[in-house]
Amino acid sequence: MSLITSTSPHATVKNNTGAFMRQVIYATLPGLAVLTWQFGWGSVINVLWAVIVALVSEALFLKARGRNIAFYLKDYSAVVTAVLLGLALPPTAPWWLTLVGVSFAIIVAKQLYGGLGMNPFNPAMVGYVLLLISFPVAMTQWLAPGEPLSLLQSWQLFTGQLPVDGLSGATPLDTFRTVHSAGASSEIELASHSILHGQFAGLGWEWVNLAFLLGGLYLISRKIITWHIPAGFLAGLGLPALLAWLIDPVRFADPLFQLFSGGAMLGAFFIATDPVSAATSRMGRLVYALLIGVLIWVIRTFGGYPDAVAFSVLLLNLSAPFIDYYTQPRTYGHKSSNRGTN
C-alpha cells in the first residue's frame, strides 16, 4: 500500500482571503440597497464603475511588476476597496471623479506599498480624501433623500449630460455645521430644516446607517471582524456627543444624530476595521477606534468638514503602530508586555 504525504500545514480552514473579502462585499449590500431606495441608482453605478476601474488598475500594475494577475485578483481586495469608495461617493459623482479616486487608491495607496498586507493606510480613504481636497464641490453634492432619481437620470448625471446643481442639496451634517458655525440653536434649526422633518438623524440617513449596522453585525456574527473596533468607534463618537448635548442641548447635536448620520456606521464596521492598517492587539483596537470616534466628533463639531470619517481613520492609521507597541499583551512566561523582557 502506498502512502501519499504532503507538506504542512495539514490542518486547514475553509476561509481564505478571497472568502473573507466576499463576505465584506455581501455585508455592504443592505446599505447599497437603502442608498438606492433613498437617492436613486447613482450609488449602484458608482460601485460598478469603481469595481471596473479597480480591477483594471490592479491588473495593469501587477502586469508591470511581473506578477500573476489572475492569482492576485482572486483575493477580492481591490473589489472591496472599490465598493467602499463607491459607497462613500455622492450618487451625483461623475465618471471621472470615481476614476481618479479609485485608480489613486489602488495604484498609489496600495500597490506602490507592495500590495495587499503592505499598505499602512486604508486605500479607499486615501482615495476619498484626495477627491475631497481636490474636488470639494463635486464631493459634497448630495441629492435630497426620499426623492430617488430614475436609472436614466442617474446615468445622465454620471456621464455629465444632466447638471447636478438644481438637484443637489445639503446633508444633515452640512446643515448642522452651518448652523453651529453661525452660533444658532442646532436643536431648533435642525428640527425645522426641510431635509430633517424631525427625524433623529435626518430623513433617510438613519435608514442608511441602520442598513450598514445590520451588515456590520453580520460580519461580527460570521467572525469576519471582532466587536472591538466598532464598539470603540461608536463609543468614541457617542460619548462626547452625549456629554456635550447634556451640557448644552441648544448648541450641540444629540448622540443619536451623530451616530446615525453621515458615514458613521459605514466607518465603524467597514472602514476602520481594515485589518492591514488598523491596530492589531485587542486593547489596541479599542484605543484606536475610540480615538477615531472622538476625532470624528471634534471635526464634525468644530472643524471645517461636515463629516470626518476619512480624515480620522487615516490619522489613526498613522498612529496604529505606536498604539500596538504600548498595548501588546504580555507574552506568556514574561512579567512585562514587552517581548524579550522578563
UniProtKB/Swiss-Prot annotation:
It is found in: Cell inner membrane. Keywords: Cell inner membrane, Cell membrane, Electron transport, Flavoprotein, FMN, Membrane, Phosphoprotein, Translocase, Transmembrane, Transmembrane helix, Transport. It comes from the Bacteria. The modification FMN phosphoryl threonine is found at residue 171. One of its GO terms (cellular component) is plasma membrane. GO terms for biological process: electron transport chain; transmembrane transport. The keyword RNA-binding does not apply. Its cofactor is FMN. Part of a membrane-bound complex that couples electron transfer with translocation of ions across the membrane. HAMAP family: RsxD_RnfD (MF_00462). Belongs to the NqrB/RnfD family. This is Ion-translocating oxidoreductase complex subunit D. It comes from Alcanivorax borkumensis (strain ATCC 700651 / DSM 11573 / NCIMB 13689 / SK2). The gene is rnfD.
